[in-house]
């Protein structure tokens, strides 16, 4: 995940969210784990998708490969 973070210039929070996605966490679980709202989680996910150039979690997971 660290090389992925550097390659796509993800923030520390975006990297945390990416790690939780890899573990299979949903938006509610991510929000609870990080002490943020579900809406904030969705905003971070949108930024991650934009930076990586994907439209879905499955595409993100495929890029993380």
What name fits each language-model region?
Residues 14-21, 60:
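Short alpha-helical "packing" element that flanks the helix-turn-helix/winged-helix DNA-binding module
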């Amino acid at each position: 995940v660290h090389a992925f973070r550097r390659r796509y210039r993800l923030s520390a929070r975006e990297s945390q969210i990416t790690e939780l996605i890899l573990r299979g966490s949903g938006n509610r679980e991510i929000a609870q784990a990080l002490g943020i709202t579900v809406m904030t989680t969705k905003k971070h996910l949108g930024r991650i998708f934009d930076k990586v150039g994907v439209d879905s979690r499955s595409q993100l997971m495929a890029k993380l490969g």
